[in-house]
Design a protein with these regions (language model features):
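Short, solvent-exposed loop/turn segments enriched in Ser/Thr/Gly
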Residues: 40-44
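Intrinsically disordered, low-complexity acidic Ser/Thr-rich regulatory segments
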Residues: 1-38, 48-53, 81-82, 87, ...
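Forkhead-associated
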Residues: 45, 50-87
Length: 101
């Protein structure tokens, strides 16, 4: 669910194995941000739900980073397992945030 930014209060239903890609490029992302969101890369990150383990797999592809609510920057191109309820931020600000429900 969107916590802040363009997609605040938006909900994205994800079945097991489903993947969302966040970014500014409609060719590379299915959750698309306007060009004014300079801290969001063309292909910023992907989020996949792993129903078997009841977790999300988040992979950062960006120049500006994807962060968890603890302020930890995810390592670029390295899938990271995150628990339900974790909040992720696209870019260095908390302008675009999503809770992994």
């Amino acid at each position: 669910m969107g916590v802040s930014g363009k997609y605040e209060n938006a909900s994205f239903d994800m079945e097991d194995g489903a993947e969302l890609v966040f970014g500014r490029s409609p060719q590379e992302a299915n959750i698309v941000f306007d060009q004014v969101h300079a801290d969001v890369s063309r292909k910023h990150c992907s989020v996949r739900f792993d129903g078997r383990n009841n977790q999300y797999i988040v992979t950062d592809f960006s120049a500006t980073g994807t962060y968890t609510d603890g302020g930890v920057r995810l390592e670029k191109n390295q899938p990271k397992q995150l628990s339900r309820g974790t909040v992720i931020y696209l870019g260095g600000s908390k302008q675009n945030a999503f809770r992994l429900n």
